[in-house]
Amino acid sequence: MSSKLRVGVAGPVGSGKTALVETLCIALKKRYKIAVVTNDIYTKEDANFLIKKKILEEGRIVGVETGGCPHTAIREDCSLNKNAVMDLENKYDPLDFIFVESGGDNLAASFSPELVDLSIYVIDVSAGDKIPRKGGPGITRSDLLLINKIDLADMVGANLNIMQNDTNMMRDGKPWFFTNLSSGSGVDNVIKYLVAQIPNI
C-alpha cells in the first residue's frame, strides 16, 4: 500500500509552509485523495491548525512531535515521519498525495529520498532579496522552489527582478514560482506542476 506521490514541504519559520499545504488540500481534495503529516518540535500546532480549519477529515492529518532538529526528522532519522506516512497509507489506501510538512528550518533543509518522492521549498520575500543567491540545498536542489509573499516586496524593499535573476542562476533550469498564498497568486502553477508528477492519472 502506498500513495502515488509523497510531497515534502520545507522552508524557514513563517515562510508559508502550512499555508501552502492548506491551500493545496482545499484545491485538490475534490478530485484527489489526500493526507498530511506535519512536524513540530514539541507540539502538534500545525496539525491542530489544519484540523480546526477542516481542510480534510481529521484522521487524514497527523502531527509528529520531533523532539529535536527539524532537519534530522526529515533526513538523517526520518523514522517517525516514515511511520506516520505508512500508517496513513495503510488506513486510507489508495492515496494520491501525502504532504509531509517539515518544521521550520534553515536553507540547508532537505528530505530523505526514503521519505518523499519530491520536495517543495518555500522562502518568502520578507527575508530580503538576497535569499536566493545565498543558495543551500533548499534553494538549489529542491524539486520546486516557491518565493512567497510577493505582495510584501515594496514594504521590505525587496526587488523581485533581482530575486528572479538570482533564482534562475541558482536553480539552473529547475522549476520555481513566485506566489502570494494569501491571495492565491501562483497557486495554479503549483497545482499544475504537482498533478503532472502523479503517475497514471
Curated annotation (Swiss-Prot):
One biological process term in Gene Ontology: urea catabolic process
GO cellular component term of the entry, any: cytoplasm
InterPro entries: CobW/HypB/UreG_nucleotide-bd, P-loop_NTPase, UreG
Swiss-Prot/TrEMBL keywords: Chaperone, Cytoplasm, GTP-binding, Nickel insertion, Nucleotide-binding
Localization (cell): Cytoplasm
Keyword GTP-binding belongs to the record: yes
Keyword Lipoprotein attributed: no
Regions that span the bilayer: none
Gene Ontology molecular function: any one: GTPase activity
Binding positions (GTP): 11-18
Subunit and interaction comment: Homodimer. UreD, UreF and UreG form a complex that acts as a GTP-hydrolysis-dependent molecular chaperone, activating the urease apoprotein by helping to assemble the nickel containing metallocenter of UreC. The UreE protein probably delivers the nickel.
Function: Facilitates the functional incorporation of the urease nickel metallocenter. This process requires GTP hydrolysis, probably effectuated by UreG.
Entry's family note: Belongs to the SIMIBI class G3E GTPase family. UreG subfamily.
Protein name: Urease accessory protein UreG
Source species of the chain: Prochlorococcus marinus subsp. pastoris (strain CCMP1986 / NIES-2087 / MED4)
